[in-house]
Amino acid sequence: GCGGNGLVLSATDSRACRKVAVKKIVLSDARSMKHALREIKIIRRLDHDNIVKVYEVLGPKGSDLQGELFKFSVAYIVQEYMETDLACLLEQGTLTEEHAKLFMYQLLRGLKYIHSANVLHRDLKPANIFISTEDLVLKIGDFGLARIADQHYSHKGYLSEGLVTKWYRSPRLLLSPNNYTKAIDMWAAGCILAEMLTGKMLFAGAHELEQMQLILDTIPVVREEDKEELLRVMPSFVSSTWEVKRPLRKLLPDVNREAIDFLEKILTFSPMDR
């Protein structure tokens, strides 16, 4: 298959007697090199039950990858083999409430771990969430867009336009791509829970403006600073009363009250309330 930024193959590690996934990353230009360096730096730090385990990172012909990548044209990330991903599972139909609850719990465990390590995933979506069908273990993978959320880490803080799947983007990310926190991953997790419970994407806009309109139709804007910003940048998108047309309870009539209560807490317009 193909991951977010490379070809993924299954293989057998004959020394360890285990099946592995090998992610090939072609380092053809400065941008792909930057993404690869970022992913390798991050994944080497992570070790958790709900994160795809990386065993080693190799250069061409299995050579050890020492130091910088700049002398190589390709790198191979050897990682834990996972049978399927959440996107494939959802294509087969809606999950049971019990399965959705189990997977959401594990997703939040994984997020708590990476966030405590000061890492934002930034591209959470069903295709980046892997499932072992044998024991129903969920693991977060594909850290190609992840960012270290540390003020001492040298980065400009900008999300490259078009990289993050827009259906899982938080309203803050749509309004200002250069201003984000760990709350963007929580928004994506909420969208994924709704999708697990209904089998349909929660907000599936054709473009960024429609995406924001769908969000504003359902998610109330509470904070005055958010209202002021929306009136300034997209006045035609908001109602004069600030009432939503289709609150979550109406949009998701078949989802139980407990899940709706949780979604209302995680899918807030302001990241500070999440």
UniProtKB/Swiss-Prot annotation:
Keyword Kinase included in the entry's annotation: yes
Active-site feature positions: 123 (proton acceptor)
Coiled-coil residues: none
Protein kinase domain residues: 1-274
EC class of the enzyme, as a word: transferase
Signal sequence residues: none
Short motif (SEG motif): ranges: 160-162
Cofactor(s) the protein needs: Mg(2+)
Regulation: Activated by phosphorylation in the activation loop.
Residues where ATP binds: 1-8, 23
PROSITE patterns, sorted: PROTEIN_KINASE_DOM (PS50011), PROTEIN_KINASE_ST (PS00108)
Role according to the record: Atypical MAPK protein. Phosphorylates microtubule-associated protein 2 (MAP2) and MAPKAPK5. The precise role of the complex formed with MAPKAPK5 is still unclear, but the complex follows a complex set of phosphorylation events: upon interaction with atypical MAPKAPK5, ERK4/MAPK4 is phosphorylated and then mediates phosphorylation and activation of MAPKAPK5, which in turn phosphorylates ERK4/MAPK4. May promote entry in the cell cycle.
Subunit structure of this chain's protein: Homodimer. Heterodimer with ERK3/MAPK6. Interacts with MAPKAPK5.
Family per similarity comment: Belongs to the protein kinase superfamily. CMGC Ser/Thr protein kinase family. MAP kinase subfamily.
PANTHER family, A to Z: MITOGEN-ACTIVATED PROTEIN KINASE
Protein's UniProt name: Mitogen-activated protein kinase 4
Naturally occurring in which organism (per UniProt): Rattus norvegicus (Rat)
Upper lineage: Eukaryota, Metazoa, Chordata, Craniata, Vertebrata
Gene expressing this chain: Mapk4
